[in-house]
């Protein structure tokens, strides 16, 4: 997908959201705020043939227990297609890739909705989660045992 195609998809998405001037920045990034709480970043990933969506989960840096939960979620593919990761600043983000070949404004809007649903699920999970000191000492190979 070329930059003009990415810009066209964002423009189409903007029209469906009531933001007709939606376009990528010079750096190729588009940021959308939802509910005044979530900032979704939309960027083209040419090397992976994807449009990547990224959204922070909660505030602050991930602690060890949260990092373990994220790793387990990724291992079990429990994120509904979203991948939990640590941003360079240490905050937790969920990311979701959308295939460029299948990408349209409707597809992108559905993917954003799915990502935001996962972010909200994670935020609830992190509020409920109590620090689990023993979790850091558990053997991760337990998850890989066959029965």
Predicted features, each with a name:
Residues 1-40, 87:
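Charge-rich, low-complexity N-terminal segments
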Residues 27-29, 48-52, 89-93:
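A generic structural signal for beta-strand entry/edge sites
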Residues 32, 40-58:
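Short, well-structured hydrophobic secondary-structure segments
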Residues 54-97:
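Short, internal acidic amphipathic alpha-helical interface segments
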